[in-house]
């Protein structure tokens, strides 16, 4: 399963609402440098950033953190999933 990086999702939500990255930075007090690396797919969304985005955009911080976790798991599965399946045997009960 291929999931979009949260930066793409954030950028899309902002575009739909006509909110610039600069405005998001000013009104959430998230540094512009952090927003820039998030929307460019170079950094994950932290719990604090999720709280700030949820407060500003509405909804729950859990949505942002859950999407981030799903993305991270998908990336890790592509990177090392086969190796883990070979190295780790299921526990026998």
Label the predicted regions.
Residues 1-19, 66:
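A short, Lys/Arg-rich alpha-helix, primarily the initiator
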Residues 13, 34-38, 46-48:
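A generic structured-segment signal
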Residues 15, 26, 55:
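Short polybasic/polar patches that bind polyanions
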Residues 19-40:
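Short alpha-helical DNA-recognition segment
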Residues 40-42, 69:
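Residue-level detection of the helix-turn-helix DNA-binding "recognition helix"
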Residues 42-55:
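Short, basic-rich loop-to-helix N-cap that marks the start of a DNA-contacting helix
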Residues 55, 63-93:
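Short, charged recognition helix plus adjacent turn
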Residues 59:
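Short glycine-/polar-rich loops that comprise or flank the Walker A/P-loop
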């Amino acid at each position: 399963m291929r999931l979009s990086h949260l930066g793409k999702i954030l950028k899309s939500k902002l575009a739909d609402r006509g909110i610039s990255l600069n405005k998001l930075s000013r009104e959430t007090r998230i540094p512009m440098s952090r927003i820039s690396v998030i929307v460019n797919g170079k950094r994950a969304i932290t719990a604090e950033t999720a709280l700030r985005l949820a407060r500003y955009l509405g909804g729950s911080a859990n949505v942002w953190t859950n999407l981030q976790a799903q993305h991270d798991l998908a990336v890790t599965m592509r990177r090392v999933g086969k190796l883990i399946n070979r190295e780790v045997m299921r526990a026998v009960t």
